[in-house]
A protein has these predicted regions:
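C-terminal peripheral helix-coil segments that are non-catalytic and often amphipathic
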Residues: 1-5, 104, 140, 144-152, ...
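Helix-turn-helix
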Residues: 16-19, 23, 27-61, 65
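Short amphipathic alpha-helical elements of helix-turn-helix/winged-helix folds
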Residues: 23-27, 65, 101, 105, ...
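Short coil/turn segments at alpha/beta junctions that flank glycine-rich nucleotide-binding fingerprints
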Residues: 30-34, 109, 152
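Short helix-capping/turn signature of helix-turn-helix
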Residues: 56, 116-123
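Hydrophobic alpha-helical connector segments
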Residues: 65, 79-108, 165-168, 192
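Amphipathic alpha-helical packing segments from all-alpha helical-bundle domains
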Residues: 72-79, 125-152, 162-166, 170-177
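Short, hydrophobic secondary-structure boundary micro-motifs
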Residues: 113-117, 128, 154, 158, ...
């Protein structure tokens, strides 16, 4: 690890927290959470140990904040997709975008994987609640698209939309959890296509190239991002 990230004023609360979290994130990745004392986080952040303790009760609370921030960002993917629907995008493209955005978020934050694995083992880390909230946001988005498509007669009549949405989302999550963070753009696009196609063919009765536009199926969502 190189020298301090930059000295921060003792009273500069928000920037101090950000700098401490940035330092902890780097150190929790390597050498790892168990091998990182608060003093080392403080040194890399360019602040005193007392300053760290002014903002965090202990090392575990720093880990918990990193995990909460990560999961909040993941949860926002579902909210962003719902609020920023492109009326000219096809329904298939909306599903594909969800998969790609979730994949890129994981790649961009791959350095947090070791810290997240540690947090999963801590009952008070808040990881479980944050994970459930993120899953709910993503699943609800998928289900709303599929239910709207059912209203237009585009889905298989023998499929329970809520059950299928949950099962398919779990499949996507399982696939993304094993994603190589060093995946190339070409690999990302290939995986995105495969997961989107699996969703589509499991639920819809028409080929993806005949997918209607969002403005035809999801008019109740349009304009919310304005």
């Amino acid at each position: 690890v190189s020298g301090p990230l930059g000295a921060v004023g003792e009273g500069d609360g928000d920037s101090t927290v950000t700098t401490v979290l940035t330092a902890a994130r780097r150190l929790f990745h390597s050498p790892g959470y168990a091998s990182t004392p608060v003093s080392r986080i403080a040194h890399l952040a360019g602040v005193s140990r007392a300053t760290v303790y002014n903002h965090f009760s202990d090392k575990r609370s720093i880990l918990n904040q990193l995990v909460r921030d990560y999961m909040a960002g993941y949860e926002q993917i579902g909210a962003h997709l719902r609020l920023q629907v492109d009326p000219k995008a096809s329904i298939f493209d909306l599903l594909r975008t969800m998969v790609r955005d979730a994949m890129l978020w994981r790649i961009d934050n791959a350095d947090l994987r070791p810290a997240i694995e540690v947090a999963k083992q801590m009952p008070d880390s808040g990881w479980r609640e944050a994970d459930e909230a993120a899953d709910r946001a993503m699943h609800d988005w998928l289900a709303s698209v599929h239910h709207a498509a059912r209203e237009r007669g585009l889905t298989r009549s023998d499929i329970d939309i809520d059950f299928a949405s949950g099962a398919l989302y779990s499949m996507i999550e399982a696939s993304l959890s094993t994603l190589n963070p060093a995946a190339s753009r070409q690999e990302v696009e290939k995986i995105t296509d495969q997961l989107a196609l699996l969703q589509w063919h499991a639920i819809y009765t028409i080929p993806p190239e005949r997918s209607p536009l969002a403005e035809e199926v999801l008019p109740f969502l349009l304009g919310r991002g304005a």
